[in-house]
Regions:
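Small-residue (G/A/S/T)-rich helix-start motifs and N-terminal tracts that mark the onset
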Residues: 1-119, 123-141, 145-166
Length: 166
C-alpha cells in the first residue's frame, strides 16, 4: 500500500472531494472504475456525474460514491456546478457526441479550477483545438500516444513523440 496511514479519528472531509464526470451509454464501466480509483487514491469523498442510465449501476457497484445525474439519459450534456469540489476529472466513457462537446466547452469556459482531462475529453479537445488555450491554469492532460498525436501532430518515431512532448 502506497498510502500514508490516516489518523484514527480523521474526518473524510479532510481528504478532498473529487468530482468525476464520466460514463455514458455502454460505457458505465468507465464511471465505476474511475470512481473506484479516486477512492483508492485516497479521496475522502467522491461524486460521480453520470447520465441518468448510470444511477442504478453506480449505486449497485459503488454505493460509497455519491451520484450527480445529468439531465440526459445516455450522455454527458450539462456540466454540474464545480463549486464544493477540491478536484475534478473528466473524460472516460463520455463519447464525443455534439451535445457532449458543447457541455465540455461550457465546463471549460465556466471554471477557473484545474481539471484533469482524460480519454474522450482529450478526443473532444483534439476536435476543438481552440479550447486548449482556454483550459484552466494548472489543468492536467493524460493522453496515451495516439491521443497525444491527435492533440498535436502525427509523428514518425517514438523519439519524435518524446521531443514533441517536451
Amino acid at each position: 500500500d502506497h498510502m500514508l496511514p490516516r489518523r484514527r479519528f480523521d474526518h473524510k472531509g479532510r481528504y478532498g472531494h473529487v468530482l468525476m464526470i464520466t460514463g455514458g451509454y455502454g460505457k458505465m464501466g468507465a464511471a465505476v472504475l474511475t470512481s473506484k480509483a479516486a477512492l483508492r487514491a485516497g479521496s475522502g469523498l467522491v461524486t460521480t456525474h453520470v447520465p441518468r442510465l448510470g444511477y442504478e449501476i453506480m449505486q449497485t457497484a459503488l454505493p460509497e460514491a455519491m451520484i450527480s445525474l445529468d439531465i440526459s439519459d445516455i450522455i454527458f450534456s450539462h456540466p454540474p456546478d464545480l463549486d464544493g469540489f477540491s478536484h475534478v476529472g473528466i473524460g472516460p466513457g463520455l463519447g464525443t457526441k455534439e451535445n457532449t462537446q458543447t457541455a465540455l466547452e461550457t465546463l471549460i469556459k465556466r471554471t477557473k479550477k484545474p481539471v484533469v482531462f482524460d480519454a474522450d475529453a482529450l478526443n473532444i479537445l483534439s476536435l476543438k483545438k481552440e479550447l486548449l488555450d482556454e483550459l484552466p491554469e494548472g489543468s492536467i492532460l493524460t493522453p496515451h500516444p495516439k491521443e497525444f498525436e491527435r492533440l498535436t501532430e502525427p509523428v514518425a518515431t517514438h523519439f519524435e513523440r518524446i521531443e514533441l512532448q517536451r
